[in-house]
A protein has these predicted regions:
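Hydrophobic structural segments
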Residues: 1-288
């Protein structure tokens, strides 16, 4: 790593990230780009995270990072105050006082090529990738769009694929669950990093064998399967987006002579999981 005089400024790193993930590619409701930080401040170390939360902020401070690159926006919804006694206000004040800049790439990174779903597909060894939902205005064959469709290294049953996905993604309390016939053969798989039930119709139209995403809900899943859609796999939101951190970190290292770290902190909010077992003998009654 070079000295401070030769280090890039925040504006340089932001400009590079904006070229890779243009802000114009973000959804209209999204909030991406530089959230806070002095554009002229030197960047010697970057921490890549899925969520900018108090725990990852403390990681950044302990690592002496100058910039946090986050996937999820800190200020996605309007706030009326960033006073230090509010949740987001505390984060903002902590970062500003510590001279740590914050940059977010969200839906613009989702549709990029390579982007969030490419990283997820890479974890599973998918080949012959193509977008699940091509981006509006993307040139034919460009590869930009939401989600990816690819071929698994070998045909697996849905049950086998569920275990395979769980073994390839970062471990979380939520794990991986599947919907459909466990013996159904799967070779062509669609994936989408993050919440993906909005694209259930696209997965069905694409004719894939199964679709992996996060945050699937009861009624959309039930109706999708009843309508003859592909099998489904549901993983933790954080776990499906965490692979992208490795990709963006490697790219940043290639662009600048700086240290780039990846947070391994699981920011999935779920901390417990128990599988209900029917007809347990001798179940102990819990007194109120």
């Amino acid at each position: 790593m070079t000295d401070t005089a030769a280090s890039p400024a925040v504006r340089d790193v932001v400009a590079a990230l904006d070229r890779r993930y243009p802000r114009a590619w973000a959804e209209s409701w999204d909030r991406v780009g530089l959230v806070l930080g002095e554009p002229d401040a030197a960047v010697r170390r970057v921490l890549c995270v899925v969520d900018c939360v108090p725990e990852t902020v403390e990681q950044a401070l302990e690592a002496r990072a100058d910039l946090i690159v986050a996937h999820h926006p800190l200020l996605l919804k309007p706030v009326s105050s960033i006073a230090p006694d509010t949740y987001k206000g505390r984060i903002i004040h902590r970062l500003i006082r510590s001279d740590v800049a914050l940059y977010c790439a969200h839906t613009n990174a989702d549709v990029a090529d390579p982007g969030v779903s490419d990283a997820l597909a890479g974890r599973l060894g998918l080949t012959a990738l193509r977008p699940l939902v091509p981006a509006t205005g993307a040139a034919a064959g460009e590869g930009r769009g939401t989600g990816r469709i690819g071929e698994l290294p070998a045909t697996m049953t849905l049950g086998e694929l569920t275990g395979f996905v769980a073994s390839r993604l970062p471990g979380t309390t939520s794990g991986v669950r599947s919907a459909g016939d466990p013996e159904r053969p799967v070779r062509t798989l669609a994936v989408c990093g993050g919440a993906g039930d909005a694209f259930l119709p696209d997965a069905r139209r694409a004719g894939v064998d199964a679709y992996l995403c996060a945050d699937l809900r009861h009624h959309p899943v039930s109706e999708h399967l009843a309508d003859g859609g592909p099998a489904l796999l549901d993983a933790a939101h954080w776990a499906t987006e965490r692979p992208w951190l490795d990709d963006v970190a490697a790219w940043l290292r290639g662009q600048f002579d700086i240290d780039v770290l990846v947070s391994e902190l699981d920011t999935d909010p779920w901390t417990g999981h128990a599988r209900a077992v029917p007809d347990l003998p001798e179940t102990k009654e819990i007194q109120p």
